[in-house]
A protein has these predicted regions:
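Glycine-rich FAD pyrophosphate-binding loop
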Residues: 40-61
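N-terminal Rossmann-like FAD-binding beta1-loop-alpha1 element of flavoenzymes
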Residues: 20-47
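Flavin (primarily FAD) binding-site architecture
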Residues: 230-244
């Protein structure tokens, strides 16, 4: 979304240039995942990305994905884990702001999410990198990315490494996004690059029904019959956050 974003009433929209079921704003990890799931559910999907290519902040990240509960990589590396142990650790690590229902869903579905990533082409090497670094300099696929093995957490839940890293030395976010964007581009979803979201469009009841987009100065109005999903969460365009 641009800094000048506003909410425009649908009654002021003279015509819809594009109509779709779901409009996804932002093609980072969240946007690509949303687009893939929406297409899989049978929706027509348009994806908007203000950059000339997708990836966003996700592509420049370390790409470490927190997965557990007994993934194939954990098992092949000799570590036992379960959704319950993962749940107990996350409940302790998240402190007073934890949401038990969300954490339970995250832990219970974690192995399925691993298989989802692999199914979309993301590779993981079943080798444990023992030296904590946050991001291994090797292409090893499993690290301790949190405090699972530290007191007091190792007294609350059985420790297990859960940092899953796509198979490439160094920052793996680029490989993660390369695979997810390639998966999106194999679907009927329509990525629109160099396009920014200028405003959301809402009806008289306040329901968001579309968005106003701008590509190289040309405005287009997109109607989203089933919803607009905002996944433009990257901070790289926020100068204050970059300076911090």
């Amino acid at each position: 979304m641009s800094e000048a974003s506003i909410l425009r009433p649908s009654r002021n929209i003279q015509r819809w240039d594009v109509e779709t079921d779901v409009l996804v704003v932002g093609l980072g990890c969240a946007g690509a995942s949303t687009a893939l799931e929406a297409v899989d559910a049978g929706a027509d999907v348009v994806v908007v990305e203000r950059g000339s290519a997708g990836g966003g902040t996700s592509a420049s990240s370390g790409g470490v994905i927190y997965l557990g509960g007994g993934t194939p990589v954990q098992k092949e590396c000799g570590f036992e884990d379960s959704p319950e142990e993962m749940f107990k650790y996350l409940m302790a690590a998240c402190g007073s702001h934890r949401d038990p229902a969300k954490i339970r869903a995250y832990a219970d579905d974690s192995v399925a999410q691993y298989h989802w990533l692999v199914g979309h082409g993301v590779p993981f090497k079943a080798v444990f990198y023992p030296d904590y670094s946050g991001e291994p300099p090797t292409d090893d696929g499993l690290v301790y990315s949190g405090n699972e093995n530290c007191y007091p957490f190792n007294q609350i839940a059985k420790p297990a490494p859960r940092g899953h890293v796509p198979q490439i030395p160094g920052k793996a976010g680029g490989l993660l996004m390369e695979k997810l964007i390639a998966a999106v581009e194999k679907t009927p979803a329509k990525p629109m690059y160099d396009t920014r979201c200028e405003a959301l469009v809402a009806d008289d009841d306040g329901q968001v029904v579309g968005a106003v987009l701008k590509t190289f100065g040309e405005e287009r109005c997109v109607r989203a019959r089933r919803g607009v999903v905002l996944t433009a969460g990257g901070f790289i365009m926020n100068r204050d956050m970059v300076r911090a």
